[in-house]
A protein has these predicted regions:
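Conserved AdoMet
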Residues: 40-116
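Mobile active-site "lid"/loop adjacent to the S-adenosyl-L-methionine
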Residues: 201-231
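Non-catalytic accessory regions of SAM-dependent methyltransferases
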Residues: 1-48, 52
Length: 294
C-alpha cells in the first residue's frame, strides 16, 4: 500500500501554486494556478471533475515527490506542455516535447479555415509545409477522411513527433516527408487543392526577447530571418504553381505581416487574397486562391 502523505490534495495544490509564483525565474509563472493543477493531474489522476470530491483526501507520498519534481522543472522555465508530454489541438491530444513546436490555440483558425474550404473537395490533395507535430495535417486528415494529406518537415526531431502522432491518431491518410520546404524533394508534386503552413515568422532579432518558455522551443521553428518573411518569400517562388485551379494557399502570419504577405501572394498571381483576423481582431492568416480554369 502506498505510504500516505501528511497533507491533502488541496494543500499540495496550494503548495504547487506558491512554488510557481515565488520560485520561477527570472519572473513568476503567469499561469501558476493552471500549471500547478495540470501537473497535479499528471501525477494523481485527478481532474476538474473529481478534484472537488477528492481535494481533502490524503495524497500518497510518492505522488508528492513526483509532483515536486515536475514543479521544479516548470520553475526553471520548461514549458508545461513539454513536461506533460502532450497538448490539445482542436479536441485531440498531440505528443510534444523538446525539439518540436507546441500547438497553439491561435493556429486552430488556420486548420478550421482549411477544413471549411476543403469540405467542398472531399477527395482532395493537401500539402502542409513545416509540419512540426502534425497537429494541422492530422486534424485535416481526421476531419476529412477522403483527403490525401502530405506533411513536409525538415527537423529529424520534429519528424519523430509527427510520426508518433500519426500512429497515435491512426492518420492513415497522412504521409510524412522529411525535407526542406524551401527546396522540396522531388516527391512533392502538385497539383494540390490546398497548401497550408505555419512557418517560422519571428524576426531573428526578436528571438532573445521572447518569453523564456518560447525560447525553449526549437529556433528553426521560430526564426523567420531578418524581418520574419524569409519563408513566405521562398515559398512564393515554389508553391503557388503547385496549386490546382481554384486551389487554396493559406498561411499563419505575425500580427504586423499581413500586408507584406498578401502582396507576395498577389505578385504570385493568386486571386481573392485576404487577411483573416483572429478573435482578438489581430491579423492571423493570409490566404489566396489559384485562378480557376477558364
Amino acid at each position: 500500500m502506498p505510504t500516505a502523505g501528511k497533507g491533502t490534495y488541496r494543500e499540495l495544490l496550494r503548495q504547487g501554486e506558491h512554488l510557481l509564483r515565488r520560485r520561477v525565474h527570472p519572473a513568476p509563472c503567469d499561469d501558476a494556478a493552471t500549471d500547478a493543477f495540470l501537473l497535479l493531474e499528471k501525477v494523481s489522476g485527478l481532474n476538474r471533475t473529481n478534484y472537488p470530491l477528492k481535494k481533502d483526501e490524503r495524497y500518497p507520498q510518492a505522488e508528492r515527490e513526483e509532483y515536486l519534481a515536475l514543479l521544479r522543472r516548470r520553475a526553471t522555465g520548461e514549458p508545461v506542455q513539454y513536461i506533460l508530454g502532450e497538448w490539445d489541438f482542436m479536441g485531440r491530444d498531440f505528443t510534444v516535447g523538446p525539439g518540436v513546436l507546441i500547438p497553439r490555440p491561435e493556429t486552430e483558425q488556420l486548420a478550421e479555415a482549411a477544413i471549411d474550404y476543403l469540405r467542398k473537395r472531399p477527395k482532395c490533395r493537401v500539402l502542409e509545409l513545416c509540419g512540426g507535430s502534425g497537429c494541422i495535417a492530422i486534424t485535416v486528415a481526421k476531419t476529412l477522411p477522403a483527403a490525401n494529406v502530405t506533411a513536409l518537415e525538415l527537423s529529424p526531431e520534429a519528424m519523430e513527433y509527427l510520426r508518433a502522432n500519426m500512429a497515435r491518431h491512426k492518420a492513415d491518410n497522412v504521409t510524412a516527408v522529411q525535407g526542406d520546404a524551401l527546396c522540396p524533394p522531388p516527391t512533392i508534386q502538385g497539383p494540390y487543392d490546398a497548401i497550408l503552413s505555419n512557418p517560422p515568422y519571428i524576426a531573428s532579432g526578436e528571438l532573445p526577447t521572447l518569453q523564456r518558455e518560447v525560447r525553449r522551443e526549437p529556433a528553426m521553428a521560430l526564426d523567420g530571418g531578418t524581418d520574419g518573411l524569409d519563408f513566405y518569400r521562398g515559398f512564393n517562388d515554389i508553391y503557388p504553381r503547385m496549386l490546382a485551379p481554384g486551389g487554396l494557399l493559406l498561411y499563419e502570419i505575425g500580427e504586423e505581416q499581413g500586408e507584406a504577405v498578401a502582396a507576395l501572394l498577389r505578385n504570385a498571381g493568386l486571386e481573392r487574397v485576404a487577411i483573416l483576423r483572429d478573435v482578438y481582431g489581430q491579423p492571423r492568416n493570409v490566404l489566396g486562391y489559384a485562378p480557376d480554369e477558364n
